[in-house]
Amino acid sequence: ALMGYASVYLLEKGFTNTQIGLLTAVGCIVSAVLQPALASYADRPESPSVRTMLLGANLIQLVLVISLAATAESSSMVVRTLLYGASITMLMLMIPFVNSLGMETIRQGEELDYGIGRGMGSVAYAIASWLLGRLTASFGADMIPIWAIALNILFLICVFHFPFKKDRKKAEAEKE
């Protein structure tokens, strides 16, 4: 919702196309700079599991989009820029951790069809995008952060119930 409908939402909030492009670019660049440090931290034996890190990132993302929705009419351009930019950064930070969670689960011998999962994710994105388009056309662009809240809660529930255990033996063996 946040990336696919960034222009729709931000144009309605008074941003120019140039500002929207810069905001999304900066959000993605900040994420790209932070990803190696977070990945390095996640690989340490004493670090929380990828699942726990995803839950934490998702909670931060949820707070950001709730703040965005709650201040939709009252906030300044600066506040909207910071909230939307941070939301984009968090969203982009979570993607490699989702992939890592799947790959580590497979490596641990659990049955997981990654291709089917990716395909289902694409179909779900298409349906969610279509539905959000209909909602936005009917109720306005303020539906976008509300939809993002709903998707974040759904993602939080899915990750919370994902059966993952951090493989500390592998991490300790790599340390030696």
Where are these regions (language model features)?
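Structural signature of the two symmetry-related core transmembrane helices
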Residues: 51-67, 149
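Helix-to-loop junctions at the C-terminal end of transmembrane segments
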Residues: 33-48, 136-137
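Helix-loop boundary and gating motifs at the non-cytosolic
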Residues: 1-32
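Paired intracellular helix-loop junctions of major facilitator superfamily
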Residues: 102-113
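Symmetry-related core transmembrane helices of the 12-TM Major Facilitator Superfamily/SLC fold
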Residues: 144-161
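Glycine-rich segments within core transmembrane alpha-helices of 12-TM secondary carriers
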Residues: 30-32, 112-133
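Flexible cytoplasmic inter-helical loops of multi-pass small-molecule transporters
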Residues: 109, 160-176
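Hydrophobic core of transmembrane alpha-helices in multi-pass small-molecule transporters
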Residues: 64-67, 71, 75-97, 101
